[in-house]
């Protein structure tokens, strides 16, 4: 999950400050004590999102690393970036920023036959198409998990035709895709585990490697929950025409990559489960803190290594319903009558939060960047909302309430996550009132309705 390794990176920043202190320069606030600088750095790093944390992480590496001992990789030439193959897999991914027609061509290739879609519709599935997009948010993903479980217990949660996930949302999405039978696992993942179950400190990685933390605990958690039986369930649902997409970021190309996890699960390749797990880990990989995930591809018979990291670096939440509009409105699919519905779970607060800002460089930078990031996330919501207005899709938004005031004593504090899970659960179990437009767009929504 994005932010899982936050504490490790903060420790690395502390090390940088100690280094600067010994060298006699570079202090953030010469009038304050060094301890205060460290405390300010902790607060600064705690609030930064993956895309902008990268700059601080890079700074720490530049200041402390004389050389790296990372194993060399065979980098894919820029000219071949659009010609890659993954051995044993076909049509399993697309660029998230590609033209809709190109994406649609990939998604429609080898689609299940009409009789499979009709069989799905016959399983008492509502005639309306339901889409779900789950954002990242680190430990705040507990809100989305609780919301989904409470929604199930309210008896109103639909089966989703399309589910997308990024970062912590990527770890929620497969369970949401499979349905309420997996709610127990969702509850477990976001209430049973803490920081030590997610990562271990690896300060030596600043000097010797590509990461500040060891992601082995998180990888083991993914392996625990994503087993062969789990993959078979995903494959069965994909055969019915349902779609699960997970987003990663290709660092070499600076582009979002969307993975069709159902097609990976349907593959007969023995490495399908390995790739499935890798993609979940990559989507949750905060760059510079966790090591990037290498994914081997082939071009012209030669093997190359791509570097994939947190999907939230390029998209905090994503959906592309227009790509699937032909299927959503196809009468043969059993979903041609009612208006499709999109549900967006934003694992974070979208309301302004007041805070007294100290007049020093750290506080000013901290507040400015956290404000920028919050508004970037809202910008993603605007983009999605505009697509739904264009394509005639009902927009529904959930986010952490402004009055949720529980705080964490440490990253991934179980007490905090349990409280947030229960808040999401309580809201959904009492018939949650979904917001019909992003902040500031309510009047536009009312004018069109």
Language model region names:
Residues 34-55:
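Bacterial N-terminal signal peptides that target proteins for export
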Residues 165, 169:
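Gly/Ala-rich beta-loop-alpha elbow adjacent to hydrolase catalytic centers
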Residues 3, 24-26, 55:
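Residue-identity detector for glycine
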Residues 2-8:
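Extreme N-terminal basic, low-complexity initiation segments
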């Amino acid at each position: 999950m994005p932010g899982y390794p936050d504490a490790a990176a903060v420790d690395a920043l502390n090390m940088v400050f100690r280094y600067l202190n010994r060298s006699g320069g570079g202090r953030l606030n010469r009038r304050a004590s060094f301890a205060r600088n460290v405390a300010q750095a902790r607060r600064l790093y705690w609030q930064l999102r993956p895309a902008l944390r990268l700059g601080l992480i890079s700074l720490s590496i530049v200041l402390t690393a004389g050389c790296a001992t990372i194993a060399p990789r065979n980098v894919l030439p820029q000219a071949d970036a659009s010609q890659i193959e993954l051995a044993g897999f076909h049509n399993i991914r697309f660029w998230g920023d590609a033209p809709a027609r190109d994406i649609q061509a990939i998604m429609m290739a080898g689609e299940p036959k009409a009789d499979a879609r009709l069989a799905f519709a016959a399983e008492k599935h509502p005639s309306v198409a339901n889409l779900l997009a789950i954002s990242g948010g680190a430990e705040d993903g507990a809100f989305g998990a609780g919301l989904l479980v409470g929604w199930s217990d309210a008896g109103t949660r639909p089966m989703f035709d399309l589910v997308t996930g990024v970062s912590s949302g990527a770890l929620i999405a497969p369970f949401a895709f499979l349905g309420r039978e997996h709610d127990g696992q969702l509850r477990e993942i976001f209430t049973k585990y803490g920081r030590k179950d997610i990562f271990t400190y690896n300060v030596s990685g600043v000097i010797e490697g590509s990461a500040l933390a060891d992601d082995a605990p998180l990888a083991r958690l993914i392996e625990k929950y994503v087993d062969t039986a789990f993959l078979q369930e995903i494959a069965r649902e994909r055969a019915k025409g349902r779609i699960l997409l997970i987003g990663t970021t290709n660092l070499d190309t600076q582009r979002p990559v969307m993975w069709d996890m159902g097609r990976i699960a349907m593959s007969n390749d023995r490495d399908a489960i390995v790739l499935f797990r890798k993609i979940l880990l990559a989507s949750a990989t905060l760059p510079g803190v966790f090591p990037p995930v290498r994914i081997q591809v082939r071009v012209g018979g030669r093997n190359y290594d791509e570097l994939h990291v947190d999907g939230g670096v390029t998209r905090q939440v994503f959906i592309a319903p227009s790509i699937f509009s032909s299927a959503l409105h196809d009468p043969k699919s059993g979903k041609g009558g009612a208006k499709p519905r999109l549900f967006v779970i934003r694992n974070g607060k979208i309301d302004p939060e007041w805070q007294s800002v100290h007049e020093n460089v750290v506080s000013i930078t901290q507040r400015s960047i956290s404000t920028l990031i919050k508004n970037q996330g809202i910008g993603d919501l605007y983009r999605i909302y505009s697509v739904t207005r264009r394509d005639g899709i009902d927009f529904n938004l959930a986010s952490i309430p402004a009055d949720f005031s529980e705080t964490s004593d440490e990253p991934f504090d179980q007490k905090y996550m349990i409280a947030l899970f229960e808040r999401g659960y309580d809201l959904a179990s009492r018939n949650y009132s979904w917001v019909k437009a992003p902040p500031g767009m309510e009047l536009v929504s009312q004018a069109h309705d």
